[in-house]
């Protein structure tokens, strides 16, 4: 027979043998896709390792002391490694110490930290500062003692304030956007370029993103601020007593109390 009954849902569809043969011939005419050999290699571009064992690396008894895989992935935040910035633990200790001495909550400390940062922008972070620092409550000045801020700052207050560098820079940018503004540190250094106002505070942290011009301005301002500063290793020792005995005899005819005659000459009559 030339007809084939297709067993489907209703069993009534009829397919001719001719249609089946034509479909088979079409499939034979198509070429099969070639299988990819799993063992074949493509012409890939070679990648060189940035750090190889052929370098002159530190060795102990023939064993390399570096873990190269870890070293390649080790890319910490640069500023976290600066020894000019207090560590996170030191900053936390300073914060908790100030909060305890001021007897404030965390929310209240957030309000205190803002004006203290602005005060440091204007007045600097010298270790010699003392007395009080001032914040403004509307038109009213509110004074706070500086002692907790300075005494709890380890190693120094400037190293603590380096944590505020980015926030202080953004604050100065905001002030400059609303009108002419130059921090007092820049006014004392006679900084004339208003575009560099964002760098005119003494706890600015120079980093890889700082432009060459700004870095030069920061270095010049720091050199000018420290030009007349002398650090003495030892101060005056107050525990000094005279233990020598003066046995020299003097008369009224001596030139002075330390000299009998002046090159053989007596005292003038």
From Swiss-Prot:
Basic and acidic residues bias: start-end ranges: 9-36
A UniProt-annotated Pfam family: Poty_coat
Gene Ontology cellular component annotations, sorted alphabetically: viral capsid
Domain of life: Viruses
Stretches the record annotates as Disordered: 1-45
Similarity remark: Belongs to the potyviridae genome polyprotein family.
Record-given protein name: Genome polyprotein
């Amino acid at each position: 027979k030339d007809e084939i009954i297709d067993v489907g849902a209703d069993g009534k569809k009829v397919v001719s043998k001719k249609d089946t043969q034509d479909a088979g011939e079409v499939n034979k005419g198509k070429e099969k896709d070639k299988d990819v050999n799993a063992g074949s290699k493509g012409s890939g571009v070679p990648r060189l390792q940035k750090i190889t064992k052929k370098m002159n690396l530190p060795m102990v008894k023939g064993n390399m002391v570096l873990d190269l895989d870890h070293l390649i992935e080790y890319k910490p935040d640069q500023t976290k490694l600066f020894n000019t910035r207090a560590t996170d633990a030191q900053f936390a200790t300073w914060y908790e110490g100030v909060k305890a001495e001021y007897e404030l909550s965390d929310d209240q400390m957030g309000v205190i930290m803002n004006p203290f940062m602005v005060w440091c922008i204007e007045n600097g972070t010298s270790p010699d500062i003392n007395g009080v620092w001032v914040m403004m409550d509307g038109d009213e000045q509110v004074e706070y003692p500086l002692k907790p801020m300075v005494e709890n700052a380890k190693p120094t207050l400037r190293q603590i304030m380096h944590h505020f560098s980015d926030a202080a820079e953004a604050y100065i940018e905001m002030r400059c956007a609303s009108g002419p503004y130059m921090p007092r540190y820049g006014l004392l250094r006679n900084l004339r370029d208003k575009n560099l106002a964002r760098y005119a505070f003494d706890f600015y942290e120079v980093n890889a993103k700082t432009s060459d011009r700004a870095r030069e301005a920061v270095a010049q301002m720091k050199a000018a601020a420290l030009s007349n500063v002398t650090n003495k290793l030892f101060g005056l020792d107050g525990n000094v007593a005279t233990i020598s005995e003066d046995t020299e005899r003097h008369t009224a005819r001596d030139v002075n109390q330390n000299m009998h005659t002046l090159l053989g000459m007596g005292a003038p009559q």
